[in-house]
């Protein structure tokens, strides 16, 4: 009767659960972190280390967090935690952006506009309360993601101290000569009733009217002479302009052409039986004439654009307004006619041209910009014939103006155009350029542009294309409009002269005094302040301005209001945000940093892409393809979300779907199962008692420690360059290939069948201890909850949390004089692969069942055979086969053959051995198992 030898085996045993059950287990871990003040402990353990400062860009305090928020915060958290393991003190101070329009809109919906049911002070208080509520909700969700930080003392742009520091930052900028006031065209949203920053604009497709309008020459013969042509007496001469904004024509004050472009004088369409010659850019003439119904290009002359400068034209519908022709380098021959109508109140380039020609002072504010803040023509706007423009909204005026142009005979062509057009990011409505008195940070007055361009080159950009992108933006951006005509924000505390409009000569000093008061009483003090307290006898000569600061200025000065205020160094080591922040926070921070300190406030900038579905479509409720982070956490756990983020190339768009989440869960399961198997085989192992020195380890165990050392070097380098996808892939490959398909499979025999205290078994356990101690650190920044759980099962004495340690120092490379070198193992593993390939058809054809039923013969070159023959007795354990024979052969490589064994199977280790049945007490066991059960135990050297 056969005996049950199972009790003589040392099978894996661990309480570490097979199932992660993350939605239930993570909250308990989070509760413990809260109870133990994990962040404070982390900082205490890191005290005295070099500082690594990742400065948090503030999310807006409005609404639930979405997947983009989760991506951003988790990437930051991975970096912070990896830096702690790398030997740094890496504080993380989260922040919130609290002022601005979205909160105003939320309060207006609930209470009405300012001055209706609430005065401005009450309105701001409601905004403050609303922001505080939103922060609480978002903070809860961020913490649930496993984000570790100073959640009890975050920075908030609504804090009195922050608002005061923001005013002090503005005072510095005033001191440096960067602040100017001017009437310039700025992005304007009629729904907001305010100017918009570049970062508050998004481009969406829009259908616009597209018209070609003729501007008749007032001295046609002189203009024709420029083209060396003689104008017949019965022929009109005009320059057609092409525009998609007919509503701007009442503000049209000039025509611009390109000075170096080639223009031709061509035969145009007749009007009321009268011939008409037109001036068109040569490159666009045929296409333009086709729009006018003319197939043949008949040229009467040619000239450069510069030759037409200062010729005078009639306005298409205001007969008493003369239109000069000016030169503008912004005019191109890409589309249209090569001539653009110029409305300096509604276009930045138009405004610049008028500035260059010194023409701005010739016109009233209403002539430059006849449109009010709501998008309605002013009462002073002249009618267009019988069409009254005053009081008419510009979008309604567009088709009426086109009809009026047609009646007057100056409309050459009209159609509709589908194009990308700027919209307000909040209201999703089209915006315009509108000249209004605003406060600007000048890009030129104190050489801010050139200094910012230089500073960009001293920053490391991830990905590298980020540098070229922001360089292009800074090169081409206009002055920064920092004033807003809203209620909820930090005031621009300037006193301006009642008559000249000039700021008080001691503005910066006054602003600092006001900042001191704001720090104690908040921004309301500015509006209630009796200015005689600060200005004394000058008070009657000055008035306060009521504009507030752009919210991008709020977040743009956090390097001053947060880092300096908390004693942290500038510049920060890293800013990390979405790719849209090249024109947002990265840029506003850069400009304020350079304006104040002549340096960028960051050493490195890293950007991540946006989340899309598996088809590359933006996630949205309307498409029904959105996946919320809260749903992932409830069903799968935060670590699954964290693993997806880490495993994705975040430099591009990040695809997510249920199928991708399933694959991520499978990857997580592989990591968890590997950790569980390692822990299971550490049952009964105490590193203080049983750890085997590296030099005494079995060769295979020593090699896997060497492989782990190599991987740790790779992983550390990848964390340093923020390549988390490489880390995940490296870990998964290690789990599947080095461990799953090789090391763990091979060492099962030793771990299960040897005596508990056998040196060969303790050697394998030592290797697995080293692997687990390193492995838990590798995954800790990414799988924070799982690493915390795994760490608690690691045998031996250690710190309370894996993040209180640094990278594992128990790994080491194989020395060059090792009995089996890394090169030897490369060859042996290649041989092992060949053995597997030889056995596959034998298994498929039923010659053998398991590989243990095969006996292997390896014929190799003499020197290779001589190297491998000492290993012969143990090669069967590496191959997990029956006996292995190595013979020398006349070959450069090696040849593998196999045959089915005729030997009996051991009932305990399942190996097929010739000595089974030789022992009377254990007739079913091989000699090796007998010595492991009843004797001193087997000896192993190699595998």
UniProtKB/Swiss-Prot annotation:
BP-aspect Gene Ontology terms: isoleucyl-tRNA aminoacylation
Q: What are the alphabetically sorted keywords of the record? A: Aminoacyl-tRNA synthetase, ATP-binding, Cytoplasm, Ligase, Metal-binding, Nucleotide-binding, Protein biosynthesis, Zinc
Task: Decide whether keyword NAD is in the record.
Answer: no
Cofactor section? Zn(2+)
Q: Which InterPro entries match?
A: aa-tRNA-synth_I_CS, aa-tRNA-synth_Ia, Anticodon_Ile_BEm, Ile-tRNA-ligase, Ile-tRNA-ligase_type1, Ile-tRNA_ligase, M/V/L/I-tRNA-synth_anticd-bd, Rossmann-like_a/b/a_fold
Report residues binding Zn(2+): 906, 909, 926, 929
What's one Pfam family here?
tRNA-synt_1
| Stored SUPFAM superfamilies | Anticodon-binding domain of a subclass of class I aminoacyl-tRNA synthetases (SSF47323), Nucleotidylyl transferase (SSF52374), ValRS/IleRS/LeuRS editing domain (SSF50677)
User: Which parts of the sequence form the motif 'KMSKS' region?
Assistant: 618-622
Q: Which PROSITE patterns would you find in this protein's record?
A: AA_TRNA_LIGASE_I
Task: Report one GO cellular component.
Answer: cytosol
Presence of the UniProt keyword Oxidoreductase in the record: no
Which molecular function term from Gene Ontology is one that the record holds? aminoacyl-tRNA deacylase activity
Residue numbers of motif 'HIGH' region?
Answer: 59-69
Which compartments does it reside in? Answer: Cytoplasm
Q: What is its EC number?
A: 6.1.1.5
Reactions accelerated catalytically: tRNA(Ile) + L-isoleucine + ATP = L-isoleucyl-tRNA(Ile) + AMP + diphosphate
Question: Per UniProt, where does ATP bind?
Answer: 621
Q: Where is L-isoleucyl-5'-AMP bound in this sequence?
A: 577
Q: What domain comment accompanies this record?
A: IleRS has two distinct active sites: one for aminoacylation and one for editing. The misactivated valine is translocated from the active site to the editing site, which sterically excludes the correctly activated isoleucine. The single editing site contains two valyl binding pockets, one specific for each substrate (Val-AMP or Val-tRNA(Ile)).
Query: What HAMAP family does the annotation carry?
Result: Ile_tRNA_synth_type1 (MF_02002)
Could you say which protein family the record assigns here?
Answer: Belongs to the class-I aminoacyl-tRNA synthetase family. IleS type 1 subfamily.
The identity of this protein, by name, is Isoleucine--tRNA ligase
